[in-house]
Amino acid sequence: MLKEFKEFALKGNVLDLAIAVVMGAAFNKIVTSLVTYIIMPLIGKIFGSVDFAKDWEFWGIKYGLFIQSIIDFIIVAIALFIFVKIANTLVKKEEPEEEIEENTVLLTEIRDLLRAK
């Protein structure tokens, strides 16, 4: 059972997924801090409120925080889209060459020999 788990864990797809999760978590922290500490204060200054995210609420519904989460999501989605587009262009899938069956090769050789006579 341990051997099967080792084979599963060391497959390329599982390792790629694990790396993607760790990188995604780290990237999410960067984007969250960008939105929280740079973008939202700028939006707050534009609308005349120092803390846009926390000050904007209506009947206890903090829609400022919701807007901040939406901006956070949009930035992550755009960055991931760009990353995937770049990765897809770098890793082009090679089209498999058409394999000719052995029978076809032999028949072609026989045909060529008969034509030569």
Swiss-Prot record:
SUPFAM superfamilies, A to Z: Gated mechanosensitive channel
Keyword Hydrolase: no
Bilayer disposition of the protein: Multi-pass membrane protein
A GO MF label: mechanosensitive monoatomic ion channel activity
Gene3D superfamilies registered for this protein in UniProt: Large-conductance mechanosensitive channel, MscL, domain 1
One GO cellular component term noted in the UniProt record for this chain: plasma membrane
Annotated InterPro entries: Mechanosensitive_channel_CS, MS_channel, MSC/AndL, MscL_channel
Swiss-Prot/TrEMBL keywords: Cell membrane, Ion channel, Ion transport, Membrane, Transmembrane, Transmembrane helix, Transport
Location in or out of the cell: Cell membrane
Transmembrane spans: 7-27, 30-50, 64-84
Function as written in the Swiss-Prot or TrEMBL entry: Channel that opens in response to stretch forces in the membrane lipid bilayer. May participate in the regulation of osmotic pressure changes within the cell.
Similarity comment text for this entry: Belongs to the MscL family.
Subunit structure: Homopentamer.
Protein name as it appears in the record: Large-conductance mechanosensitive channel
Annotated organism of origin: Staphylococcus haemolyticus (strain JCSC1435)
Lineage: Bacteria, Bacillati, Bacillota, Bacilli, Bacillales
